[in-house]
């Protein structure tokens, strides 16, 4: 399973839904890639 938008995540083990989402190192949640 992958993590949805604004879900808490770990930047060193990014499980956010690809390819749209990426784990923000600053905020520690899944954000849309710009």
UniProtKB/Swiss-Prot annotation:
Q: Name one GO cellular component term.
A: extracellular space
Which keywords fit this entry according to its UniProt record? Disulfide bond, Ion channel impairing toxin, Knottin, Neurotoxin, Secreted, Toxin, Voltage-gated sodium channel impairing toxin
- Cell location: Secreted
Q: Tell me if Coiled coil is a UniProt keyword of this record.
A: no
Q: In which tissues is it expressed?
A: Expressed by the venom gland.
Q: Name one GO molecular function term.
A: toxin activity
Q: Where are the transmembrane segments?
A: none
The family this protein is said to belong to: Belongs to the neurotoxin 10 (Hwtx-1) family. 08 (Gtx1-15) subfamily.
Name listed for the protein in its UniProt record: Beta-theraphotoxin-Ps1a
Keyword check for Lipid metabolism: no
Q: What is known of its domains?
A: The presence of a 'disulfide through disulfide knot' structurally defines this protein as a knottin.
What is this protein for, i.e. what is its function? Potent inhibitor of Nav1.2/SCN2A voltage-gated sodium channels (IC(50)=0.6-0.7 nM). Also weakly inhibits Nav1.1/SCN1A, Nav1.4/SCN4A, Nav1.5/SCN5A, Nav1.7/SCN9A and Nav1.8/SCN10A (IC(50)=20-610 nM). It acts by shifting the voltage dependence of channel activation to more depolarized potentials and by blocking the inward component of the sodium current. It shows low affinity for lipid bilayers. In vivo, this toxin causes general ataxia, lack of response to stimuli, and semiparalysis. After a few minutes, the mice are unable to stand, and breathing is reduced in rhythm and intensity.
Q: Which GO terms describe its biological process?
A: envenomation resulting in negative regulation of voltage-gated sodium channel activity in another organism
Q: Which PROSITE patterns match?
A: HWTX_1
Instruction: Kindly give the Pfam families that the UniProt entry links to this protein.
Output: Toxin_12
InterPro entries, per this entry? Huwentoxin-1 (IPR011696), Huwentoxin_CS1 (IPR013140)
């Amino acid at each position: 399973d992958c993590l949805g938008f604004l879900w808490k995540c770990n930047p060193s083990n990014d499980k956010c839904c690809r390819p749209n989402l990426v784990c923000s190192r600053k905020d520690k949640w899944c954000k849309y890639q710009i």
